[in-house]
Amino acid sequence: MKKLILLMSALLLAACGGPSAPERGEGYDVAEQNYRELHHRLLVMDSHLDTPANLSNPDFDILADNPSKLGRVQVDLPKMERGGLDGGFWVIYTPQGPLNVTSYEAAKLAALKRSDEILQLIEMHPNEFELATTADDAERIAASGKKIVYKSIENSYPLGTDLGMIEEFYNRGVRLIGPVHFMDNQFADSATDLSASDLGGLTPLGEELIREANRLGMMIDASHAADSALEAIMEVSSTPVVLSHTGVSSLYDHPRNISDDLLRKVAADGGVIQINALGAYIEDLEPPAERVEAMQALSEEFSGISPFDLSSNERERYLARRQEINETYPMPLSSFDVFMDQMLHALAIVGPDHVGMGADWDGGGGVAGMEDVSDLPKVTERLLEEGYSKEDLEKIWGGNLLRIMRQAEAAKQN
């Protein structure tokens, strides 16, 4: 419903041209009613929603306003409505085990199960959610009043060495694929795996993965990739890369962030950085000593066990212990201002054509003042205060992602 106004605005912009960016403090009255009204007219997407991890939890109801304690439920339908979030990329995340055939098979089954859970969400709530597989789907679904569900893969480890599985996941709706996660794998070097030997960026199998994704029309997500892997991906890929949840290292030097020089290369290649809101990646936050001790004990208890070898009871026990630690010894939070510093710095370096939002909701993201997706209008308010235009906001909140998706679709056709 809200997007009917957006469609009319798009026609007017096409006839008259987009507005020029106002100077700071000019152009828009950012009184609460006005910035919220504008925000809810925009097509608002996030490129990294870890919410599918909650779908197997019997206590989770996507239609309910679930308790929003940080680290638990940050995305559900009421919060999306309040925050003007139209949807985005719902993540198929699979933890990594040993690099062997048995573990690959177990990981593949886990990833397929998660993919099916996303489809089941849509089947159970067809009036609220719809699967999107093309760039044009986003506007249509949002205009219908439903939430947009694109699928993405975080960590291609479950593919094993069978690249035919990329097409299998494509046929199941996946349109964004990340080769690697916290550890080096069969495809690429990870930004955070400091113990393993250097694979040289992409392995030969990793290069094949990128080419196959290009052939199918999938976008490439280089978040979690080492710098060498990111540069190799840009060299091999025929389409620009997406950094679905990443920060800038010039403000906080963390392996998950990238330098200004590398960010400029991503932008020159047509890519986009979607700014992460995971506090420990954007600010030096010291965890409580009790938390470190408890997490170490939990790690030692499950040391050497592949996550796919755990029984359902063991998995539930592990997750319950993790949740107990999170609630008893929570990590200190970063702040909304620190998050916005990250976004504004990226905008200053590469401009609004190459920056977006990928806060890592339900996967560790969220800061004080922006604890869940209901707080997203605050980002629009701040960007307006900084002088960014409605046209800029349209790009930042989803337009840049859809541009790259259209490029991927065109590359497939060619």
What residue spans do the PLM features occupy?
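Sec-dependent signal peptide recognition
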Residues: K2-A10
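Intrinsically disordered, low-complexity segments enriched in polar/charged small residues
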Residues: L7-M8, A53, S250
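N-terminal hydrophobic targeting/anchoring segments and the immediately downstream early-domain regions
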Residues: G17-L199, D253-N414
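Divalent metal-binding pocket/active-site signature
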Residues: P158-G160, N171-R256
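Short, linear, compositionally biased motifs with a strong N-terminal bias
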Residues: A10-L11, G173
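C-terminal motif of bacterial Sec signal peptides marking the signal peptidase cleavage site
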Residues: L13-A15
